[in-house]
Amino acid sequence: MKDLINFLKRQTQSEEFDAIRISLASPDMIRSWSYGEVKKPETINYRTFKPERDGLFCAKIFGPVSDYECLCGKYKRLKHRGVICEKCGVEVTLSKVRRERMGHIELASPVAHIWFLKSLPSRIALLLDMQLREIERVLYFESYVVIDPGMTPLTRGQLLGEEEYQKLVEQYDDEFTAKMGAEAIRELLRTMDLHAEVVQLREEINGTNSETKIKKYTKRLKAIESMLASNNRPEWMILTVLPVLPPDLRPLVPLDGGRFATSDLNDLYRRVINRNNRLKRLLDLNAPDIIVRNEKRMLQESVDALLDNGRRGRAITGSNKRPLKSLADMIKGKQGRFRQNLLGKRVDYSGRSVIVVGPTLRLHQCGLPKKMALELFKPFIFSKLQFRGLATTIKAAKKMVEREAPEVWDILDEVIREHPVMLNRAPTLHRLGIQAFEPILIEGKAIQLHPLVCTAFNADFDGDQMAVHVPLSLEAQLEARSLMMATNNILSPANGEPIINPTQDVVMGLYYMSRERLFAKGEGMTFASVDEAEQAFLNGAVDLHAKVVVRVREVVVGEGGERTESIKRVQTTVGRALIWNIVPEGIPFEMVNVDMTKKAISRLINHAYRTLGIKASVIFADQLMYLGFSHATRAGVSFGVEDMEIPVRKDEIIQAAEREVKEIQNQFASGLVTDGERYNKVVDIWSHANDQVAKVMMEGLGVDEVTVGNGETIKQKSFNSIFMMADSGARGSAAQIRQLAGMRGLMAKPDGSIIETPITANFREGLTVLQYFISTHGARKGLADTALKTANSGYLTRRLVDVAQDLVITEDDCGTTDGLQMAPLIEGGDVVEPLAERVLGRVLAEHAVDPASGDVLLEAGSMLDERAVQLLEQHGVDNVRVRSVITCKTRYGVCASCYGRDLGRGHKVNIGEAIGVIAAQSIGEPGTQLTMRTFHIGGAASRSAAISNVEVKSSGQIRLTNLKTVVNRDNALVAVSRSGEISVIDEHGRERERYKIPYGAVLSVREGGAVKAGQIVVNWDPHTHPVISEVRGRAKLIDFVEGVTVREQSDEMTGLSSMVVIDPKQRGGAGKELRPLVKLVDEEGNDIFIPSTEITAQYFLPAGAIIGIRDGDLVEVGDVLARIPQESSKTRDITGGLPRVADLFEARKTKDPAILAEATGTVSFGKETKGKRRLIITDASGEQHEVMVPKWRNITVFEGEHVEQGETIAEGELTPHDILRLRGTAELASYLVKEIQDVYRLQGVKINDKHIEVIIRQMLRKVEITDPGDSSFLRGEQVDRSRLLEENDRLEEEGKVPACYEPVLLGITKASLSTESFISAASFQETTRVLTEAAIRGSTDRLQGLKENVIVGRLIPAGTGLAYHTERRERAKLGEVTEPETPIIDTAEVEEALKQAFSL
């Protein structure tokens, strides 16, 4: 008997595998899968409902309809299993074989597989080197194709029309073969000699210099080589046998009323079979050619529709006018097999309900309605009931549960204890969207949720619903408890800050408690302990806000974790003393002795977590919440209309603004300003007025005046309810209060442009009809935007997850010394993000050295925690090199040292952590908070562009970096480089501010000079661009022809005259060739060279340049030879928000990108063409690099100027590809991180840099081969970095030449599609193309990523699954076989075993 059970079990076991391979199926392969040929289009007999023989549901081919029963009913029961009935031919077995047995159709004429024909680039066309159009003409019987030209002048693969073919047949008779249809193409493919083609293509590639030809040949070569490597034959792309899907995968279901619901595939198969049978008949009848041809074409079309309906021509529709769902549609798209059934499955043991607040819960608990719990834990209850002997059978137990007997509730309590459940709120944007809690049984039907986890779930209680899931197995419960419990997810994985921050009511309550009020009851009292103060408060002897002195016991945790205890008297308030009562030991009193705003509370919890650990901080957070709720209730903070105090000065501010606007209108009317300028100025004036009103209003709201006994008034912080809500961070913001009590301000039109008439009213005064109408614009756009934003943000997250899903921490340390240089982020002189924040939780790549003494502060390889970061700050270190994922040398995955701290846990990252997915979630989750609009630079932005000096904000020493200067005749420094920067260093050697220095700026300080705050250190003219002489000599003006190339103009104000270069377009025929230039010569008239170069000092002058010197003037170093007026740079719309982030991650090329210098060297200009200028850079070795720049582009460099590789030479937006090519990976990383962070920072979202770096690593995982060496790669081919490095290692071991390469940047979509895993790529996008390509290449998926493993139904190789996979591999290596494999036993043996078992 045991034998039999094992035998039955073994059939269900699947063997373990390590990889999946996909390739083309040969006709013989298809026949070997098949259990018989489907010859008839019939499905089932409509009288008997039995499948027709040889039809699409035939039981003989596909297996019995019901278990162990043949169709005619002669054999029934298990004992006949394996018998084939001689009457109906059906094998007696399980009916589920109808899900796996395939059939086939022998096609009367070959048919091309549409995927290999139409999926671009067409594989068939590529192999045959013909055009897709030509091949289609052959396939659909429009022309003949020559297969074997014989001795005729024709060529193989040539197309012939009908008439042409007839003529040639008359002329040459049967010396040549030409055919039409799929047979012809199949013949061409079959007779190809792939090896010979490869040899010929390689020769042609080596023999040509044309880039396009090389590209074309390489494409073909790749295709043919992949065919050879995968043992696929080209002719298999043409089908001669068509496989038929098992019938239970295309079911036919009887509905009531005698009708049937059927899968579309059955219709499509029926069509194919009908046409195929008709074609067979016609061929037997020797029908006329034209009829046969038409039938063949129809067969081809019907097979096309079956494989991919609508790919060619019109889609075949069913009776309901809808296109039929073909095999391709089954697997692609959101509703396809991959995304609907393999990546997302429905699960059992789950329920969902509305959530309500559970203010009395502890952080690790949730309230679960009894009804739900009873249903969810049913199996556990049944087994317990049986175990206790309260029910004898499962059926009896079921009855008891349905009756809801009292014993059932007791057992439910027992089952639920210590059994966590998981709560999930859709949309699950990051891993904190699913957390585990211990259920507490409650009455009612709503789930109770702990208020502190609302932030993580992004939940509120206005009708949100949540789902409950029960982890069944012991392992699942263990994981839920140790990894997913709410108490283990205190920190946000995106930025490492606490995410269980109190919000709203709790903040309000704590803030209200901690405020001080002057002259409150009991002010100045002194208490011996906090308890005494509490007693006094409860008895009404002292007010909550009274300033009092309390004696407190404070325990502080020191550097090494040692605790120091002290007792001191502190000046505080009663409320703060009450808060101190619940604060755990180890937190200093001054953290509590402040107004408890949301930020202060967050700092408190963060500090508790870092110093006291998880347990203490969780208990503390809960206590804070209870306290906050109770005091918010007692405070009774609420507001009425009177609380929105409108500032007195509002009217005068508005009138002043209106006067200014009128003034501008007048200027415009008299033609002094353009309409654009007028509009910008008006918008500017109003936004300024708005800010003023807001400021005045907040000053009014935020201050109360208290009258002292002697009649004086003292100001104190206001207790206005609205102000308190905003100030505490509980609800609302200054901007919202401004609309309530200030003025609503400027509104935007739906296209994003600003309406220049603002809404001067506020909501308290009420809006006029016109103002209300204007404001509807903005409101409606806001709603439409939100809908779009959600979809776009979700799509961005999906792409990010897909590109990063296979990145896992795989080892502890890769041992690299490489890393990224980190410095504080400084913008416009202000520190945006200090170094401490940027490097926290990273590992040092080099020693951190004290800039003053040169001592090593921290060793390389040490983790920078909060203490280490403080140390760096104290010693004024402003530049450290830290390890980064981008520079990590681990082949597959990343090492823990390059990643650093796991932000969600606060310690070094564990091996097996899926950092890719976490990074994608961290970047994608705040996506919905980003804006969608593009910003129009108006008013303020365009004005601020005209800065003309640098005024330092702090005192210190000057440091110049990267700056090339010359000394002019006034003994001042003049900058002659563009990438120079000036920074101010304080006495500790810390960098305080940093500014860019433009070309031609005059510096009034030197390196190391001391400056005072407010001193102006650099000046320049923002409106013109100077040309500065770097040598001394006499000026010689060449090609200066008055009235032709230059014209004299005098300044009305000063009366000085100067010459202006005329635009070549406006010159006569004679002047077109002339090019005005200034040349410097010595006294003898010889050329002078620019120092340390071979280039003569001559400066070509562009159109519009103003020349202030005359021929023969003496020119000193640093003199200005000419000025080029800068039209203020054209205001481009800057893309902001979500679209900007998407553009950066997709690495899109911008429309008019900046042009960067290709090499380091000296600039000169060559011969101009009609619309472009030729810019030449001569490097140190004398090699010339040419760039053609359109004339309208603003070129920022001059003749003779020295540029560094990667420096901007024509303005525009930088393209990441250029940065990578010319400045390297580190620069690219810092550019992308900065740009992406700018967008998020604007919305106040904090994301750690390392998440962005993770995605960038994935964008950089491909390299382009520049020189294949002895490898099998081709020049220009893109391959995975890890594959290339492995290949190079192999070549080096064999002593051959390794391949040379350079990194390429791919956008996230492209990177996802070009991963090594075809399963992952196919489930992402463009399923057809990915699968087609993979099949031809015979790709093998090694199942390394997470997605592939989910799809094949295994544990993911990350987290706890990593151990499982490692163990499995070890087992396989040791050669342990889990089950002894025995061959399938034949039927006689089975019968014997059965007889023995049942002793028949």
From Swiss-Prot:
EC category: transferase
Organism placement in taxonomy: Bacteria, Pseudomonadati, Pseudomonadota, Gammaproteobacteria, Methylococcales
Protein residues bound to Zn(2+) 1: 70, 72, 85, 88
Subunit: The RNAP catalytic core consists of 2 alpha, 1 beta, 1 beta' and 1 omega subunit. When a sigma factor is associated with the core the holoenzyme is formed, which can initiate transcription.
Name recorded for this polypeptide: DNA-directed RNA polymerase subunit beta'
HAMAP family named in the record: RNApol_bact_RpoC
Cofactor binding summary note: Binds 1 Mg(2+) ion per subunit.
SMART domains according to UniProt: RPOLA_N
CDD domains: RNAP_beta'_C, RNAP_beta'_N
Annotated organism of origin: Methylococcus capsulatus (strain ATCC 33009 / NCIMB 11132 / Bath)
Pfam families: RNA_pol_Rpb1_1, RNA_pol_Rpb1_2, RNA_pol_Rpb1_3, RNA_pol_Rpb1_4, RNA_pol_Rpb1_5
Binding site for Zn(2+) 2: 814, 888, 895, 898
Function description: DNA-dependent RNA polymerase catalyzes the transcription of DNA into RNA using the four ribonucleoside triphosphates as substrates.
Assigned EC number: 2.7.7.6
Entry cofactors: Mg(2+); Zn(2+)
Residues making up the signal peptide according to the UniProt record: none
Annotated residues for binding of Mg(2+): 460, 462, 464
